[in-house]
């Protein structure tokens, strides 16, 4: 029985390693360019071992993105527990996104469109995030960082549209993530902020420019 438990733990650990390795390769080279052989070679395991755990590359991509999102959600939950306000959360997300995109090849985003199941999952995630964003906006109003006269539904649609614009217009291939966030996201965010919120944004952007 103990041997079976050990084997099961090993397989679960290996599954996670395969996903993490594959996602690193996908981000570095684009999804299409990465073959199962590349993943196996990087991990120093046989391709057969990978196929015993995952049916194909699309399944690895799908599960890898899910795993990545779950980790990000857990990290954000831990960050939020530190009695942070909405502006702290926004600026933390900014730093995470900048770091994330800095190590991601633009081909990765181009290739995503070729995987409908993955795109459907991402769309579902966006729908769930919209509900969380409304609660976030209400929190910002209570804390005095966001204006009381904003329409939460319209603001949510606006920020969701910005995210889709980033992918559909391939802004990631033409501009740095800092430029996109500073010129589109932060300008839109500034419009819903109170003087208190604007001061936090301006101080942050000033510190980034120094």
What are these regions (language model features)?
Residues 127-155, 159-166, 170:
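Hydrophobic alpha-helical bundle segments that form small-molecule/ligand-binding pockets
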Residues 98-145:
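Short secondary-structure transition hinges
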């Amino acid at each position: 029985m103990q041997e079976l438990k050990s084997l099961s733990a090993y397989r679960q650990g290996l599954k996670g390693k395969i996903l993490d390795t594959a996602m690193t390769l996908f981000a570095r080279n684009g999804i299409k360019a990465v073959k199962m052989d590349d993943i196996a070679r990087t991990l120093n395991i046989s391709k057969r071992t990978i196929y015993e755990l995952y049916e194909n590359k699309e399944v690895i991509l799908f599960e890898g993105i899910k795993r990545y999102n779950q980790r990000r959600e857990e990290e954000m939950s831990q960050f939020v527990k530190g009695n942070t306000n909405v502006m702290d959360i926004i600026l933390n997300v900014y730093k995470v996104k900048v770091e994330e995109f800095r190590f991601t090849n633009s081909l990765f985003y181009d290739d995503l469109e070729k995987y409908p199941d993955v795109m459907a999952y991402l769309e579902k995630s966006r729908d769930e995030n919209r509900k969380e964003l409304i609660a976030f906006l209400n929190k910002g109003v209570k804390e005095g960082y966001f204006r009381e006269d904003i329409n939460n539904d319209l603001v949510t649609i606006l920020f969701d549209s910005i995210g889709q614009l980033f992918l559909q217009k391939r802004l990631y291939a033409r501009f740095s993530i800092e430029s996109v966030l500073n010129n589109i996201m932060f300008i839109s965010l500034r419009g819903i902020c109170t003087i208190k919120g604007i001061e936090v944004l301006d101080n942050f952007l000033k510190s980034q420019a120094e």
